[in-house]
């Protein structure tokens, strides 16, 4: 018996140990070969895989549904500190064992703390998939979290904070986040502050680990030379399937609202340029207008051919770097323009940026620009799917954000369906600089 819902096909014969294996990407008849498979295990672990023909490697990752967005002001940076601390040793591996485990096999191991998730990722030859699953399983489930290691790792993170503060085009984004989101966790620094990092203790790390690092809050994804049943067997042998579901009490996150338009300046006389971020609330991940937003954002500041690059750099020569940025989250987004210019030309450069943005916000894009933008976005989407790591991340986001998995053809159809009315709508709503928060850093303020 086969039950079909949209582009998801579940076949009773595919059930393993009472757990349905879902093939995503097939048509309703099941005739098309699926490109992604998903299994939700009884202990709450979500497992996704995508076999990539011709690949000889596998990207394997685990995402924890806990990060900066779920922290209190007093514990700002605890998610990032825990991500560091798991590498200091586990029940089976020393810190050196972890460092050598995959690199000596020609692979790589890394971790990232983001606003909504913390991820642990590996890239290995296909024959070493089990090694990757074992090592990341140890990091996620069995860290030692020792007091002596914490004292050392605090010093490392304080150095990381200093490095960011010494890099103007890094620190200005932290300043802008605080200006845009205020006291909401969206405005927190992922690294934390010096005071919060110094105050965090082992009890804080153990409490976060106990609450969040369990199968019920985990998504595992793999892409490359991997079969779904093979991945499930590897996870079973590595002990992932025997772990208890864990505490599923939701994290309390207050609704977010962006600050109104205003300007802030951080005086820095020790740098030679004024760094500027002009930005505001962006589009949420699940907003169906996301692709129209992407086209406007890309044509405004997405490359050498963009309106801002051509105007500010090529025509006026006022900046070396000028570009747009965009981050989408489950509940909101953040986007804007970054540029850096000499103190005596920074205001002129900012005025030019505003002029271009006003034009886009008022008029949207011409039909020729929209056609070119669609063509460019289609190309970027396809190119982004060439690597197994990017495909792994795309697979994980289907579970993390509750998004349907879309084949390349389906994505191309969504891009092609973007119309001028939707473009004008998102341009008016999101790209008017008069609604944005302005932050500058350098010897001289702009307004």
Language model features with spans:
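Internal nucleotide-binding/catalytic subdomain
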Residues: 258-262
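Histidine-centered active-site/metal-ligand motif
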Residues: 80, 84, 228, 275
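A domain-level signal for the structural core that forms small-molecule/cofactor-binding pockets
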Residues: 278
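Active/ligand-binding-proximal structured segments within catalytic/core domains
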Residues: 44, 51-102, 288-300, 308-312
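Short loop/turn motifs at secondary-structure junctions and domain boundaries
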Residues: 29-31
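Charge-rich, well-structured scaffold segments of protease-associated domains
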Residues: 1-22, 34, 40, 51, ...
